[in-house]
Design a protein with these regions (language model features):
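Short linear regulatory motifs enriched in tryptophan with gly/pro/ser
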Residues: 1-213
Length: 213
């Protein structure tokens, strides 16, 4: 048993039902997965990238609590908050390699929840919530998307405020920025087809996940 396993009590593999939402999105952008608890966080990163339509073009991290919530002093000092990053990005004392921590271990440390931040500029913050667990059955996929709503925002759209502004302009042909934003969206998506923020192809996501893991 390794040190992290001893702390979390996590050992035997399970299938975890995990709900992931993009924090503060309205209407809510969310996904519900069945994931093996033994998946390394580096693999969970790949799953979230595929499911939300990200392009893995920016930095990311996992943490056990909201990274933007005020911290309470402990014995008069602000506690160090650990974060899990790709091994090559670990530079600070609280940085831990995401390759060495499993999803089950992270959720145990966070008492059933965790956060994944992608793109520290736009700051796309995802909240992971453990819904249930069951034993692993033969032939169970390591990662499967079972439900969700709405496509993920476009890369480099300026966080949720910027993305919502772009969507508002697209939805209003009379908006002064409609043409500019329509051109930008077409460039980003590589398509002149109308952009539908409500679209989500679960089957396509699962095909991608099957190739990744």
């Amino acid at each position: 048993m390794d040190k992290l396993e001893a702390v979390t009590g996590v050992g035997q593999d399970s299938i975890l039902e995990v709900r992931v939402k993009l924090v503060d999105s309205e209407p809510e952008i969310w996904r519900r997965f069945e994931l093996r608890g033994s998946l390394a966080l580096s693999q969970v990163h790949q799953v979230l990238q595929a499911a939300f339509g990200w392009e893995d073009a920016h930095l990311h991290r996992f943490v056990t609590s909201d990274p933007f919530a005020p911290l309470r002093p402990v014995d008069g000092e602000i506690p160090e908050v650990p974060q899990w990053l790709p091994q090559q990005g670990c530079e600070e004392p609280g940085d831990k390699p995401e390759e060495d921590c499993s999803l089950d271990q992270l959720l145990a440390l966070g008492h059933g929840e965790a956060f994944y931040e992608y793109d520290f500029g736009d700051s796309w913050l995802h909240r992971l919530e453990l819904v249930s667990r069951r034993s692993v059955e033969e032939g169970t996929s390591p990662a499967r998307l079972i439900d969700g709503a709405r496509r993920g925002p476009l890369e480099d759209s300026g966080g949720l405020p910027g993305y919502e502004e772009i969507m508002d302009a697209l939805d209003d042909p009379g908006h002064p920025d409609h043409a500019e934003h329509a051109t930008w969206v077409a460039d980003m998506t590589g398509s002149d087809e109308p952009f539908d923020p409500a679209f989500l192809d679960i089957a396509d996501v699962n095909r991608t996940l099957a190739q990744l893991l």
